[in-house]
């Protein structure tokens, strides 16, 4: 679950981190009032969406007058912002931040942290190249990225934060400020189950103060049950409708940009299914794992979610029966096809527990389903059906 910039800043401020002050506005009148509250001379206005690249997409603008504020607010609130991190439909802009003037600045730095699954530790990253996409820095000048792994048994140590401060070229009182910021960031990360944390830019002002000008926070969705305060910040309007619907039925669904819908039980098999579809020249439209304990109802909902994607031109159902019986899956497929107006080819591959019984049920259903013998055969058939 992602947070908006204003939500992330408010959360980090609770941990004592110095953040750029901003006022949320949902219409032009509120934006003008916020602009005047901040002095009425200069402000930065930022569209609030769950995506990076807002500046290049027209989602960030400097305002030097009330007219600038009114124009920006009227033009962007209620629209959808398309950036390099969104799909072609973009994300809805329901509000903007009118933020205080923090310029000029002496330097712009980067500070971020993720859970590194290879080392099984929280890893901090810092760079002198703030204000630009960290992915671009990693690709073009990886030597400019400083990494620090945190031992979960002892947590972030002050000496680690100081080493990063020295590597960033900070001096005198700036070192102490940075240590406090990095320590607070680690505390917020652990206590709120962050999956991702970024301050970009972390600005060094001309007066020597360090300030968090932007903030990006992603929360581990699996931890929301123990984070009621954070869970209340969820903005469902920013989430993919199909992914949101899938979460209600405990389905693991991720929308992709292909045209072949996939329904599989097991994450590993689902990834293998997507790989083999691509091997045969197709493009998967989604990742969908119905899970090892899939019920008939969940399979029906999974089918509906797949077909709700208008780009889907074919469906591959790949089930390996273990805990899940193939005959139960077959019954669910039949029920779903009968309930939903299916106009695309559906290829079904069943293996394992009661696979023969499941195949028999499908054959006797009278529905236009394409049976497959093996994964390669299934992938070849669905790609051919879509291209036909």
Curated annotation (Swiss-Prot):
Substrate binds at residues 265, 322-324. Residues 9-245 form the ATP-grasp domain. ATP binds at residues 46, 53-55, 100, 103, 108. NCBIfam families: PRK00696.1 (NF001913), sucCoAbeta (TIGR01016). Gene3D superfamilies: ATP-grasp fold, A domain (3.30.1490.20), ATP-grasp fold, B domain (3.30.470.20), Succinyl-CoA synthetase domains (3.40.50.261). It comes from the Bacteria. GO terms for cellular component: cytosol; succinate-CoA ligase complex. Keywords: ATP-binding, Ligase, Magnesium, Metal-binding, Nucleotide-binding, Tricarboxylic acid cycle. Heterotetramer of two alpha and two beta subunits. GO terms for molecular function: ATP binding; magnesium ion binding; succinate-CoA ligase (ADP-forming) activity; succinate-CoA ligase (GDP-forming) activity. Its cofactor is Mg(2+). GO terms for biological process: succinyl-CoA metabolic process; tricarboxylic acid cycle. This is Succinate--CoA ligase [ADP-forming] subunit beta. Succinyl-CoA synthetase functions in the citric acid cycle (TCA), coupling the hydrolysis of succinyl-CoA to the synthesis of either ATP or GTP and thus represents the only step of substrate-level phosphorylation in the TCA. The beta subunit provides nucleotide specificity of the enzyme and binds the substrate succinate, while the binding sites for coenzyme A and phosphate are found in the alpha subunit. It holds the Pfam family Ligase_CoA. Pathway: Carbohydrate metabolism; tricarboxylic acid cycle; succinate from succinyl-CoA (ligase route): step 1/1. PANTHER family: SUCCINATE--COA LIGASE [GDP-FORMING] SUBUNIT BETA, MITOCHONDRIAL (PTHR11815:SF10), SUCCINYL-COA SYNTHETASE BETA CHAIN (PTHR11815). InterPro entries: ATP-grasp, ATP-grasp_succ-CoA_synth-type, ATP_grasp_subdomain_1, Succ-CoA_synthase_bsu_CS, SUCC_ACL_C, Succ_CoA_ligase-like_bsu, Succinyl-CoA_synth-like. Belongs to the succinate/malate CoA ligase beta subunit family. Its EC number is 6.2.1.5. Mg(2+) binds at residues 200, 214. It catalyses: succinate + ATP + CoA = succinyl-CoA + ADP + phosphate; GTP + succinate + CoA = succinyl-CoA + GDP + phosphate. Binds 1 Mg(2+) ion per subunit.
């Amino acid at each position: 679950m992602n947070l908006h910039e204003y939500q992330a800043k408010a959360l980090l401020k609770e941990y004592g981190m110095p953040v750029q002050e901003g006022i949320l506005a949902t219409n032009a009148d509120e934006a003008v009032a916020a602009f005047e509250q901040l002095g009425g001379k200069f402000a930065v206005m930022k569209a609030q969406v769950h995506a990076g690249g807002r500046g290049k997409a027209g989602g960030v603008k400097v305002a030097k007058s009330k007219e600038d504020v009114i124009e920006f607010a009227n033009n962007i609130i209620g629209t959808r912002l398309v950036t390099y991190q969104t799909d072609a439909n973009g994300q809805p802009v329901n509000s903007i931040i009118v933020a205080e003037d923090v310029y000029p600045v002496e330097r712009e730095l980067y500070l971020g942290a993720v859970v590194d699954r290879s080392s099984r530790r929280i890893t901090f990253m810092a760079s002198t190249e703030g204000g630009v996409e960290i992915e671009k820095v990693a690709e073009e000048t990886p030597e400019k990225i400083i990494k620090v792994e945190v031992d979960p048994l002892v947590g972030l140590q002050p000496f680690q934060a100081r080493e990063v401060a020295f590597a960033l070229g900070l001096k005198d009182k700036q070192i102490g400020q940075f240590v406090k910021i990095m320590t607070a960031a680690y505390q917020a990360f652990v206590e709120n189950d962050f999956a991702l944390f970024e301050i970009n830019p972390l600005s060094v002002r001309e007066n020597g103060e360090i300030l968090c000008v932007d903030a990006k926070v992603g929360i581990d969705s699996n931890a929301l049950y123990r984070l009621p305060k954070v869970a209340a910040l969820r903005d469902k309007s920013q989430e993919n409708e199909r992914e949101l619907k899938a979460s209600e039925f405990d389905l693991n669904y991720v929308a992709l940009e292909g045209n072949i819908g996939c329904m599989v039980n097991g994450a590993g098999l689902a990834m293998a299914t997507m790989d083999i579809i691509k091997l045969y020249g197709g493009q998967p439209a989604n990742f969908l794992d119905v899970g090892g304990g899939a019920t008939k109802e969940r399979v029906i909902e999974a089918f509906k979610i797949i077909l709700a994607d208008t780009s889907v031109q074919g469906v591959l159902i790949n089930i390996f029966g273990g805990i899940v019986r193939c005959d139960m899956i077959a019954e669910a497929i039949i029920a779903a096809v009968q309930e939903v107006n299916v106009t695309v080819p559906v290829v079904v591959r069943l293996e394992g527990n009661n696979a023969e019984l499941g195949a028999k049920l499908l054959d006797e259903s009278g529905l236009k389903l394409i049976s497959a013998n093996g994964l390669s055969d299934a992938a070849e058939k669905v790609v051919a059906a879509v291209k036909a």
